Amino acid sequence: MTIIKKPDLNNALLRAKLAKGMGHSYYGEPAWPNDLLYTFPIVILGTITCCVGLAVLEPSSLGEPANPFATPLEILPEWYLYPTFNMLRIIPNKLFGVISISLVPVGLGIVPFVENINKFQNPFRRPIATSVFIFGTVTTVWLGIGATMSIDKALTLGIFF
């Protein structure tokens, strides 16, 4: 047995609070003008203040000057360019290498149209997109690791032969 306490609507204090709109849930507040005029500028100014403050307190140094007569043995690009660098390095024909790199975004653009009839969002129920994602991730990691090795081990990673 549950006891339900009903509000006393004859209470003047409760009626005053209800008249002000207290006790009612509006499920959020409007974005205009609350968020766009008040919250966003404060967050943006706070972010700019943090960046400027950190730059003033701890300025970054430029490092040692470049010496053109002391180059490293192997010049590597940044880590996020390793797969592309390795693909261009292991493909002997440069035109075919550039074409193969340009086919990656084309292939990724085709995937939504191939699986357009599938209405599910669950990755286990979208086998084509899931297999393309897994194959692309494994290939990218494989090529990225191979970019840090010598050219004879770049494709096989020294595992197979």
From Swiss-Prot:
One of its GO terms (cellular component) is chloroplast thylakoid membrane. The chain crosses the membrane at residues 36-56, 95-115, 127-147. The keyword Chloroplast applies. It is found in: Plastid, Chloroplast thylakoid membrane. GO terms for molecular function: electron transporter, transferring electrons within cytochrome b6/f complex of photosystem II activity; electron transporter, transferring electrons within the cyclic electron transport pathway of photosynthesis activity; oxidoreductase activity. InterPro entries: Cyt_b/b6_C, Cyt_b/b6_C_sf, Cyt_b6/f_cplx_suIV, Cytochrome_b_C_euk/bac. The keyword Transport applies. One of its GO terms (biological process) is photosynthetic electron transport chain. Its main location: plastid. Keywords: Chloroplast, Electron transport, Membrane, Photosynthesis, Plastid, Thylakoid, Transmembrane, Transmembrane helix, Transport. It is a multi-pass membrane protein. Pfam families: Cytochrom_B_C. Belongs to the cytochrome b family. PetD subfamily. NCBIfam families: cytb6_f_IV. PANTHER family: CYTOCHROME B. Component of the cytochrome b6-f complex, which mediates electron transfer between photosystem II (PSII) and photosystem I (PSI), cyclic electron flow around PSI, and state transitions. The 4 large subunits of the cytochrome b6-f complex are cytochrome b6, subunit IV (17 kDa polypeptide, petD), cytochrome f and the Rieske protein, while the 4 small subunits are petG, petL, petM and petN. The complex functions as a dimer. This is Cytochrome b6-f complex subunit 4. It comes from Cyanidium caldarium (Red alga). The lineage of its organism: Eukaryota, Rhodophyta, Bangiophyceae, Cyanidiales, Cyanidiaceae.
